[in-house]
Amino acid sequence: MFDNLSERLERSFKILKGEGKITEINVAETLKDVRRALLDADVNYKVAKTFTDTVKQKALGQNVLTAVKPSQLMVKIVHDELATLMGSESVDLKLEHRPSVILMAGLNGAGKTTLAGKLALFLKTKKNRRPLLAACDTYRPAAIEQLRVLAEQIKVPIFMNLEEKDPVKIALAAIQEAKAKSYDTVIVDTAGRLAIDEALMNEIAAVKAATSPDETLFVVDAMTGQDAVNTAKEFNSRLDFDGVVLTKLDGDTRGGAALSIRAVVDKPIKFVGTGEKMEALDVFHPDRMADRILGMGDIISLVERAQEQYDEAEARKLQRKIQKNQFDFNDFLAQLQQIKKMGNIKDLAAMIPGVGKAIKDVDVDDSALLGVEAIILSMTPYERRHPEVLNASRKTRIAKGSGKTVQDVNRLLKQFDQTRKMMKMVSGNGLRQMMSRMPGMPGMPKA
């Protein structure tokens, strides 16, 4: 995410490395490079110029403490201004009515239908709401079927009328359905449209007028950069939407849309799509995004994702098993499945400060976890509980059953054994024993 921009900004800050103090000359040189980096990232020209002018003004107006290096100060100012540029703080959905209505709008191919499903799951699992999906794309039958499949997958009800061709009537009927069945939120999925298509723009304006939505969200593909910003401007002039959702942000190496859209249309980015999984929808936090752009990671979001998958009762049960040295492949599989639910591995690793840069050019393949799962699921229940019984013939059978090699099975067994030993070491008094064996620690045996 934003890898190219992060790399360019890091190079820009190096101009100030070795400088004893901030001067107008070295600030101008640094910010010239920063502006070029922003423009290459497809940031709006006026936004880039205003941004660097503000940073320059703040940098030259600072009394730098002797303990603070000029490059460190510049990073701090750029970080704060990036967060301000993207909106300073997250903005919640305002869902005041019952049922509340959320209207989705955007171009064809922006990911509105998938986003509608993700948002329904988000509201259901994280906001304890009872959403109803309304299929109002009357031009593309495949969109209705796609929404139906997603609704079934996330176990959320859907309202659709294949005979009706007027999206206004479908949306109003969905709201009546929600009232009758006590659903508190209606998510209206509409057809994609171009801002220059007068008939379709009039149509969605009519849907908005008829349904009086609590939230109108403009859904846009982050990877389209400046085009996303220009389209947002056109849609906003017609719809006066309440917020933006950037989809496919995990594939955006530049960041032009995320950095420009708030300043150009004066509407907040409320959510970002960060992957193909239905859980891959995050509330947009400008300060955390600024952290990631500057290579500082995003520990808070990482912890939040982990907490969402955390089950206190299961954790206590696992701790007892570890202390009794009973950690088995069933537990190992459960831990892997929790990690998978948190998101793709490369994205999770990038949230750890310094790691994102280190693995930028490394191909991290999430399908490797599927191979591990296949091996474990090819074991019998007894073998999962008692991996010590896995002899050569059993390993051969497991390899054939999982489509892997015996070497793959042996590699997993070795990793499992190391994991079990480490878990045993850090549970109870094991941590103290492990520390005592480290060089320089009390209890370290002398040579």
Where are these regions (language model features)?
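Long amphipathic alpha-helical segments used for membrane anchoring, targeting, substrate engagement
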Residues: F2-E19, R288-A447
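Residue-level signature of catalytic and energy-coupling elements of molecular machines
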Residues: L16, D42, V78, L107, ...
